[in-house]
Amino acid sequence: MTSTITRRTTLAGMAAGAALTALPAQARGAPARVFAHGVASGDPDATSVVLWTRVSVAAPVEVEWELAADAGFARIVRQGRFATGPERDFTVKVLADGLEPGGHYFYRFRAVGVTSASGRTRTLPVGRLERLGIALASCSNYSQGFFNAYDAIARDPAIDFVLHTGDYIYEHGTDAWHGDEARKIGRAHQPEHEIVSLSDYRTRHAQYKTDPASQAMLAAKPLLACWDDHESANNPWTGGAQAHNPETEGRWEDRRAASIQAYFEWMPVREPGPGRTRMQFWRTWVFGDLATLSTLETRHTARAQQVDYEPWKKAIASHADARRLEREQIGAEGRRMLSPECEADLTAAWTHSKQLGQPWRLIGNPMPIARTRVPDVVALGIIPDPASQARPLPAAVNLAWKGKWNLPFYPDTWDGYEWARERLYAQARAAGADDLVFLTGDSHDFWANRLADGAGRPAGVELGTSGITSPGDFIDSGFDRATSARLDAALAEHNPEVIWTDNLYCGYVRLELRRDRGLATFVAMDTVRSRRYRAFALKRYALERGETGLELREPG
């Protein structure tokens, strides 16, 4: 089902079927050179919100800020000054407090005689709430294309808040991933090498914040953020990362600290409360009596090292061997994903949600949680046997091997941490929260999944978003569009938890919640290779409560 987004359906100011253009910064009324990185807000509660900007000056400076109840700034409700300098990369981050619950506000900054563009923000509501609109975004890779989905989110009047579940930046060098294509469209990474130092991470964050579509979204909607892996390095765990080499890149602890410092400087997120560190980066937001959203920290505080399939490729000769791999490694007891502190905060959030009588409990989930095994794609005739080809695609070799032994698709996701997943489901059930809605990023694919624990008991549903620009796994691996679509269909057919998936399009998920129902719209971009694009509704699912719990159903 494909339908074009129009003014009446979602995107304000867009005629039916019309193309949109993410305009250059100067054409969109962006800030002057002093505020070249735009303005942003985020991490709100009922009476406060974080306001952010960065000033492009050569020496320490004092920056004024204003928060108003009107767009003309005639009714200033909060104002102040913030001193910034090179010790924080000239970023400005203030907590505007003493605000009204559910309030709508405008904000701006002033430095060296220059006033920034204004942004719009809001606080969390208290009490009765009839509707909530959230955009689910993930995997925004500057070098892989234009952030058209950000531009669409900025224009989308159904969106109240933006949840970004990680990979807000990417750490790789330009030539590590389609470098020639990145240069062709003017999207080479800065710096061009893989980032390792604090200066590197700051430079990369700065580049991403200069993007006009990113600036439009951040100025229009408050950001609710959590991180995944690429904010630091590919596939980290507590003791290192798959993409970190201590011999050439130094101590992992130093690199991780640099990435986290830059993240907190450049993102509109609160500093940790008493007794917490920046690494303990998880949040809970309460939306009146309608919903609670909790995010997870799954990379730095507790995660066990990922299972590596490579040593098993010669060791597995039977399905019994494959099940031994799952039993002894993937499902090994004690392989954590979440820290005890994060788990305790989740239980507290769910308990409070139930006490408020909220119908919805959401999880901002950095990586897929549904059980997803690879079908035997060679036996199904979807791809040829790599052994019969002189130069098979590397992805085809890996896919054929996983499919032959019916193995989990991504061992870096919850599929590689079966004990931790069962622990989370049991924890939710004990709190009366067996109807969770997981809002998931990481995979670069759209997903609609029904979840169950190891005993088959319903555990909620999962809505997964594709990348803002990061391409889907199959299409990026060299499979053509027809084969990629067949692989999507085979995954859904093979896995009881997968209702539908799509790896062909970049985009975001719009989730609209009301008291008795929800609607998830998978919004796709027809291209990320040009700033001129068309956004359309690729698929829709209603969230309804049935006899077996929370269900996803295509609207009639």
Predicted features and spans:
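Metal-dependent phosphoester/phosphodiester hydrolase catalytic core
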Residues: 2-7, 11-20, 28-556
